[in-house]
């Protein structure tokens, strides 16, 4: 069974993060943040894409698969369940469905063309408190991928 990875960069450095991806053999990182910017050095879209490129890892940003602002605010307030309910509603929108189909196609291509798996990226360290778990579950249901979560050592 082919694998799909997920990773969050909360409490990590770019170096530790890149090492985790390299050790797992990731070939494509799919950024599922609504806003691909970060106060953490190395995790904003351009810096992240450049760091991945240096390591031979592709980068795609699927903005519409990110959690809407009201969901991010709920998560920051410690209301992960509310964030997930908001994300479930958002996932039913045509824009999110289109990008979910695009994500599925990327995963299929990754499986067909490469032995290097795809990895979903968001901020939250714990996948149980992050919408990327829901997206990973969807890819498992659609393609039968085994979901594995990568964890960066906190610094």
Residue ranges and their predicted role:
Residues 1-155:
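Residues lining hydrophobic/aromatic ligand-binding pockets adjacent to catalytic sites
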């Amino acid at each position: 069974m082919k694998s799909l990875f997920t990773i969050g960069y909360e409490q990590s450095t770019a170096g530790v993060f890149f090492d985790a991806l390299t050790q797992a053999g990731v070939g494509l990182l799919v950024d599922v943040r609504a806003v691909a910017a970060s106060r953490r050095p190395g995790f904003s879209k351009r810096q992240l894409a450049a760091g991945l490129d240096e390591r031979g890892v592709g980068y795609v940003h699927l903005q519409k698969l990110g959690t809407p602002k009201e969901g991010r605010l709920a998560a920051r307030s410690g209301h992960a369940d509310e964030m997930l309910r908001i994300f479930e509603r958002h996932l039913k929108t045509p824009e999110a469905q289109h990008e979910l189909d695009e994500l599925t196609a990327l995963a299929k291509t990754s499986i067909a063309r490469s032995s290097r798996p795809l990895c979903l990226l968001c901020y939250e360290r714990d996948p149980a408190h992050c919408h990327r778990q829901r997206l990973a579950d969807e890819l498992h249901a659609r393609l039968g991928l085994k979901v594995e979560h990568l964890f960066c050592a906190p610094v």
